[in-house]
A protein has these predicted regions:
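Catalytic core of nucleotidyl cyclases, primarily class III adenylyl/guanylyl cyclases
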Residues: 59-83, 102-130
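Intrinsically disordered, glycine/charged-rich C-terminal tails and inter-domain linkers
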Residues: 1-5, 151-197
Length: 197
């Protein structure tokens, strides 16, 4: 006997194909210890800094997918945007905007960023996929938390380090990255961490 599933359930068994995206996850350190008003300001500052970073690379906001994470966000970047552009100028411009805020603000906003790429799905609720999960695990990994010494720390996946970072495009300095082992939930893999200046 064959049971025919209702139409919505058939979709879940065979979802539409994934999209390849670069994935930038930004997380505000210590966010949960702040008052609600401080959290609201920090989220606004971060949103503006991310917008300005992508604007510096000529990326239209309408092309970006965003997923709110409460204390940060995941930005899903279309494949036509070079990973080199994300590493320079997007991330340096984002950090520059953050530092301008921090020059006069208390508490300072300190962030962890992860950069990965892979296949993701978009549904009625946002974005989903194991590569997005990996980017989120990287930003939360203990070596990345411990590596946040200044305003920002960046972790890139091993595949992104090997395919882009190690070649030293533009102002990207491969020597600034240290290899770490990430063991966060289902993710067990090497990654590369650098202080962002």
């Amino acid at each position: 006997m064959t049971v025919e599933l209702p139409r919505p359930w058939r979709w879940f068994r065979h979802p539409p194909g994934p999209e390849y995206r670069s994935i930038l996850v930004v997380d505000i350190a210590g966010f949960g210890r702040w008052s609600n008003p401080h959290q609201i300001v920090a989220r606004d500052v971060l949103t503006t800094a991310v917008r300005d970073g992508f604007r510096a690379a000529g990326v239209r906001q309408a092309d970006l997918g965003r997923q709110d994470r409460g204390d940060g966000m995941a930005v899903l970047i279309p494949a036509h945007v070079s990973k080199v552009d994300i590493l320079d100028p997007v991330i340096p411009e984002l950090i520059s905007r953050l530092r301008r805020h921090n020059a006069t603000a208390v508490p300072r906003i300190r962030i962890r960023l992860s950069l990965h790429a892979g296949e993701v799905h978009r549904d009625a609720h946002g974005w989903v996929g194991s590569d997005l999960n990996t980017a989120c695990r990287l930003v939360d990994a203990e070596p990345v938390r411990a590596g946040l010494l200044g305003d920002a720390v960046l972790v890139v996946s091993d595949v992104l380090y090997r395919s882009v970072v190690r070649h030293g495009y533009r102002r990207v300095d491969p020597a600034a990255f240290s290899r770490v082992e990430v063991a966060e939930k289902e993710v067990r893999e090497p990654a590369w961490v650098a202080q962002v200046s």
